[in-house]
């Protein structure tokens, strides 16, 4: 009983300190005038202010991303573009690398556990990565206001998906369709909770692959990563088991985001002063988030993430349309 109490107390203490760090960081990010009050040699904002604020804010994002079950890029792009004085191109470039870092860290382990399926990932990745390149080129060619408006609409759409989406641990797939049979997309994995061997196959392969064209374009255009869309398509439409869908989606990000990230890198839209503190903050926050996950209430965290995305999506939409944002 004592250890349980201490564990809970430790979790809430961590949440308290995270909130305490987040308040001044978000306040500073929301008001450039406040940042400008920090003295520097030339009377301008000190060079270390924004990297420090980025580190703190992304640390909080890393915690929320783990607890809310969303990718870091989904939180990073709308929040940083909405409340920080950075150009959207730089934010999208950094957002892709934030999503990519988590995918690269998780990919080898998921393949080793036989949860991520190469047979499922390769045809999907071929389509999504090619379309992500196209999406990145479109995103860089369009005016910033249009991309910002579309980003806000997309984030609000993600909120709707999170509110309405259902999950199916083991979808019922009566028989594999002709395309998945020809590509030999099937597999076996061991369910850790029961020790049973699960044979799986997929159907509705062609509609799923067509949807990944749209997902790839959106991932490249907005720098969000695409885990929020990959899992529902793989799980609910194509019928892959939930664990296989989540693991394959994570592995897919390491391919899709890499292709789009090269476009932003080639155009000079990746700034180390933004990317380095963001990656460090997200990774450290993810480590803390895993610990808090043991004692936090998932339902509360999920609603908190949805509220945060709703707020950031509305901010991005109004910013793109040039409307005043009223809290």
Each language-model region and where it sits:
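Juxtamembrane transmembrane-helix boundary motif
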Residues: 1-64, 82, 88, 112-216, ...
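Short helix-coil transition sites and intra-membrane helix breaks within transmembrane domains
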Residues: 64-74, 219-227
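Generic transmembrane alpha-helix signature in multi-pass membrane proteins
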Residues: 77-78, 104-115, 199, 218-220, ...
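Central cavity-lining transmembrane alpha-helices of secondary-active solute carriers
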Residues: 101-107, 280, 284
């Amino acid at each position: 009983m004592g250890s349980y109490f201490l564990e809970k107390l430790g979790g809430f203490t961590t949440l308290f300190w995270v909130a305490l760090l987040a308040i001044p960081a978000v306040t500073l990010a929301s008001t450039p005038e406040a940042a400008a009050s920090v003295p520097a040699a030339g009377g301008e904002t000190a060079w270390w202010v924004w990297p420090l604020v980025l580190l703190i804010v992304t640390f909080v994002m890393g915690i929320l991303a783990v607890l809310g079950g969303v990718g870091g890029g989904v939180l990073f792009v709308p929040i940083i573009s909405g409340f920080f004085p950075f150009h959207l191109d730089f934010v999208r470039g950094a957002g892709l690398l934030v999503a990519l870092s988590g995918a690269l860290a998780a990919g080898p382990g998921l393949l080793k556990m036989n949860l991520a399926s190469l047979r499922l990932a390769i045809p999907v990745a071929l389509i999504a990565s090619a379309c992500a390149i196209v999406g990145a080129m479109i995103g860089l060619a369009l005016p910033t206001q249009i991309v910002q408006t579309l980003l806000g609409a997309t984030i609000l759409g993600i909120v709707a998906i999170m509110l309405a989406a259902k999950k199916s641990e083991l979808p019922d797939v009566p028989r594999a369709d002709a395309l998945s049979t020809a590509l030999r997309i099937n597999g076996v994995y061991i369910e850790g909770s029961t020790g049973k061997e699960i044979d799986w196959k997929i159907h509705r392969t062609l509609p799923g692959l067509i949807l990944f064209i749209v997902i790839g374009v959106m991932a490249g255009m907005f720098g969000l990563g695409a885990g929020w869309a990959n899992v529902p398509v793989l799980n609910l439409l194509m019928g892959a088991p939930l664990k296989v869908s989540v693991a394959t989606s994570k592995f897919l990000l390491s391919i899709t985001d890499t292709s789009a990230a090269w476009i932003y890198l080639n155009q000079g839209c990746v700034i180390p002063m933004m990317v380095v503190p963001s990656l460090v903050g997200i990774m450290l926050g993810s480590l803390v988030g895993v610990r808090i996950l043991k004692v936090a209430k998932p339902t509360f965290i999920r609603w908190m993430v949805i509220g945060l995305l709703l707020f950031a999506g509305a901010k991005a939409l109004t910013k793109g349309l040039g409307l005043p944002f009223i809290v």
